[in-house]
């Protein structure tokens, strides 16, 4: 009987050694897989951040270019209005000179009409220049908002990739632990497997199932 006990102890020790060896191999593989996943995640995050940075730079450059174009257009509009005002005033002056021989009343009316026309032209030019300036400001504001939203989206995407990688690592470790627990449950010695504190609820469930059969 003592020989049977010794033989049982030997088999139990041998089973435990094989189990520990297999557990170590599985944990090593899990750690290696987790390291590869983390490295891939870091690389992906770096690529995403670089792409976002490049996109932001391109958008900002485009915004600057559009703002410069709008500024040039506004300046051109203002210059054209100034030229038009000068031409109108000059034409009015010439008309006034030509009508000098007419009666004082007629001359006064023409001069007043010329002044009124010049004032209307100047006012229209100012209004057009103001509208062009406001449109340029609005366009620059919209472009800046788009740039900001693009940067925030790239950051959120990077955070999501890192979170998914973390979940993958956790799932891999849990899967390795469950596999070890199932191996212990099928080892033959149900009592010893149930007493192993590291196997958890999975080994206990397996032991119960084995006894029922």
From Swiss-Prot:
**This protein's GO CC annotations:** nucleus
Residue stretches of biased makeup (Basic and acidic residues): 13-23, 41-74, 81-98, 109-140
Q: Does the keyword Transferase apply?
A: no
Give the start-end ranges of region Disordered.
Answer: 1-158, 182-213
Keywords for this protein:
Repeat
Regions of compositional bias (Low complexity) in chain numbering: 193-213
Organism's domain of life? Eukaryota
Induction summary: By abscisic acid (ABA).
Repeat listed as a keyword? yes
Q: Where are this protein's LEA 11-mer repeat repeats?
A: 27-37, 38-48, 49-59, 60-70, 78-88, 89-99, 111-121, 122-132, 133-143
Which residue stretches belong to region 11 X 11 AA tandem repeats of T-E-A-A-K-Q-K-A-A-E-T? 27-143
Family, similarity comment: Belongs to the LEA type 4 family.
Name of the protein: ABA-inducible protein PHV A1
Per the UniProt entry, what species is this protein from, by scientific name?
A: Hordeum vulgare (Barley)
Gene this protein is translated from: HVA1
């Amino acid at each position: 009987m003592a020989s049977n006990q010794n033989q049982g102890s030997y088999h139990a020790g041998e089973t435990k050694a094989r189990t520990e060896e297999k557990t170590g191999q599985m944990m090593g593989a899990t750690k290696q897989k987790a390291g590869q996943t983390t490295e891939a995640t870091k690389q992906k995050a770096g690529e995403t951040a670089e792409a976002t940075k490049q996109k932001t730079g391109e958008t900002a450059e485009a915004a600057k270019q559009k703002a410069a174009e709008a500024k040039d257009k506004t300046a051109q509009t203002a210059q054209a209005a100034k030229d038009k005002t000068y031409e109108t005033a000059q034409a009015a002056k010439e008309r006034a000179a030509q009508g000098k021989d007419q009666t004082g009343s007629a001359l006064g009316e023409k001069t007043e009409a010329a002044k009124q026309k010049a004032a209307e032209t100047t006012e229209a030019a100012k209004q057009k220049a103001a509208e062009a300036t406001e449109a340029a400001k609005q366009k620059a504001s919209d472009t800046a908002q788009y740039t900001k939203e693009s940067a925030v989206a790239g950051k959120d995407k990077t955070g999501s990739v890192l979170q998914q990688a973390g979940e993958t690592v956790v799932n891999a470790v849990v899967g390795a632990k469950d596999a070890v627990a199932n191996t212990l449950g099928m080892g033959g010695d149900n009592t010893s497997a149930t007493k192993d504190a590291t196997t958890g609820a999975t080994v206990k469930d397996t032991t119960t199932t084995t006894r029922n059969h």
